Regions:
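N-terminal small/glycine-rich loop or linker at the start of catalytic domains
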Residues: 36-51, 118-128, 163-172
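Divalent metal-dependent hydrolysis catalytic cores, especially in the metallo-beta-lactamase
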Residues: 46-52, 64-93, 109-122, 151-163, ...
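Active-site mouth loops of central-metabolism enzymes
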Residues: 47-61, 129-137, 182-184
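Aromatic/hydrophobic pocket-lining residues that form the small-molecule binding cavity
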Residues: 63, 90, 94, 140, ...
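Short, electropositive alpha-helical surface patch
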Residues: 90-105, 169-180
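Conserved phosphate-binding/catalytic loop of the ribokinase/pfkB sugar-kinase fold
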Residues: 122-149
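Active-site core of metal-dependent hydrolases
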Residues: 141, 145, 149-217
Length: 217
């Protein structure tokens, strides 16, 4: 919603806000200096304000400071995202995130969960992106459960490549647990893409980046 800050808001007899002078039309928005909206949600954030969320030595104070800075941009909810790495490294990343989240009320309010982006991705050049392909693996439920345990049960979104072995079997299990599943860093054919959607995939992580330039619609 865009509103004109040069005009006073309307209040009732008790002094409570009744309405704001709203500007209409996209053309007016281009000149807007103030925007009212619900808080924004960032589903994939690897770090902010110089703080790396994939640092196994992440300090709670640094984590909280980065969230305060993020809050000032209008983002009120985010999913700190752990990228592909060795299983031990990913576990350490989640332990550090959990320590930071549990240490601050702001983190608990802003972070409903985490995003696991890898290691069940396509290791081929062009699709793996900046992720280290040597750590990409076929998908197994046991592997995911170990990471979920390290994350305190708070992995709420996972990005996978549906053409990778084990992923199509993993998707419905994740969905059953209430975990949102996205495709990304992938190169599925038409049939595999449809099967992934039927299995429960509902999102695409940074669509157009780390995937084939043309995907079947």
């Amino acid at each position: 919603m865009i509103f004109d800050t040069s005009k006073p808001p309307l209040t009732d007899s008790a002094g409570l806000l009744k309405s704001l002078p709203v500007e209409a039309g996209p053309e007016r928005w281009k000149r807007a200096t103030r925007v009212i909206s619900s808080g924004l949600c960032d589903l994939q954030v690897n770090g902010f304000a110089g703080v790396d969320y994939n640092d196994t030595t992440l300090m709670p104070e640094e984590f909280e400071k980065s969230l305060f800075t993020m809050l000032s941009t209008g983002v009120t909810t985010c999913l700190p995202t752990v990228i592909t790495g060795s299983e031990d490294w990913q576990i350490q990343c989640f332990h550090a995130l959990e320590e930071g989240r549990n240490a601050a009320k702001l983190a608990q309010a802003m972070i409903p969960g985490y995003h696991l982006e890898g290691p069940f991705l396509n290791p081929e050049e062009g699709f793996c992106g900046c992720h280290p392909s040597k750590w990409m693996r076929p998908a197994t439920w046991d592997h995911f459960e170990r990471l979920q345990e390290a994350a305190g049960g708070r992995i709420t979104l996972i990005t996978v490549a549906p053409e990778i072995k084990g992923v199509l079997d993993l998707i419905p299990k994740l969905v059953e647990k209430g975990i949102a599943v996205a495709i990304g860093h992938c190169n599925p054919d038409h049939d595999t893409l449809l099967r992934a959607a039927d299995a429960g995939v509902t999102l695409s992580t940074h669509l157009g980046n780390g995937i084939a330039q043309i995907l079947p619609k």
